[in-house]
Amino acid sequence: MKAVSPVRPQSRKAQVPSVCGELALHCLSEHSLGVARYKMEEEETLCLQYDMNDCYSRLKRLVPTIPPNKKVSKVEILQHVIDYILDLQLALDTHPVLLRQQPPTRTPLTDLNTDPAALVVNKQGDSILCR
């Protein structure tokens, strides 16, 4: 009669489940990375949406021609902003005191875009970018 060992030797078939387990873990971690990437993109999109909504709210507060208690669409806000800018430009162009003065020299935009000193933020409100 042969003696049987209570501990079975590891056979090749016994190793397969651990390899499958590692593969499943790897697939799970790849899936988790994909989900995490998707969540990050979703959060970035949500942040951008909040930034845009904040910019529209600021425009709505700044332009006096927009009724404060009336719900207006984003397109209406932009139309009011354009009209307000045109009105301000017309007021500047036709102001009698300004007509008599020598127009100030204006720095070309190309100089502003290339000058690193122009990139300095002066006020806290200037640091908020409406993308």
Swiss-Prot record:
Free-text tissue specificity from the UniProt record: During embryonic development, expressed in a number of neural tissues, including Rohon-Beard neurons, olfactory placode, eye primordia, and the trigeminal ganglia. Also expressed in other organs including the pronephros and liver primordium. Pronephric development begins by stage 25 and increases during tailbud stages. Expressed in both the tubules and the duct. As embryogenesis progresses, expressed in the migrating melanocytes and lateral line structures.
Domain of life of the native organism: Eukaryota
Pfam families the UniProt entry points to: HLH (PF00010)
Subcellular location: Nucleus
GO BP term (any one): neuron differentiation
Keyword annotations of the record: Developmental protein, Nucleus, Repressor, Transcription, Transcription regulation
SMART domains with a match to the protein in the record: HLH (SM00353)
InterPro entries: bHLH_dom, DNA-bd_prot-inh, HLH_DNA-bd_sf
KW Nucleus (keyword) present: yes
GO molecular function terms noted in the UniProt entry: bHLH transcription factor binding; protein dimerization activity; transcription corepressor activity
Disulfide links within the chain: none
Induction of synthesis: By bmp4. Inhibited by Notch-signaling.
GO CC, one annotated term: cytoplasm
Domain bHLH: 36-88
Role according to the record: Transcriptional regulator (lacking a basic DNA binding domain) which negatively regulates the basic helix-loop-helix (bHLH) transcription factors by forming heterodimers and inhibiting their DNA binding and transcriptional activity. Inhibits the activity of both neurogenic (neurog1/neurogenin, neurod1/neuroD) and myogenic (myod1/myoD) bHLH factors.
Assembly and oligomerization: Heterodimer with other HLH proteins.
Name the record gives this protein: DNA-binding protein inhibitor ID-4
Gene of this entry: id4
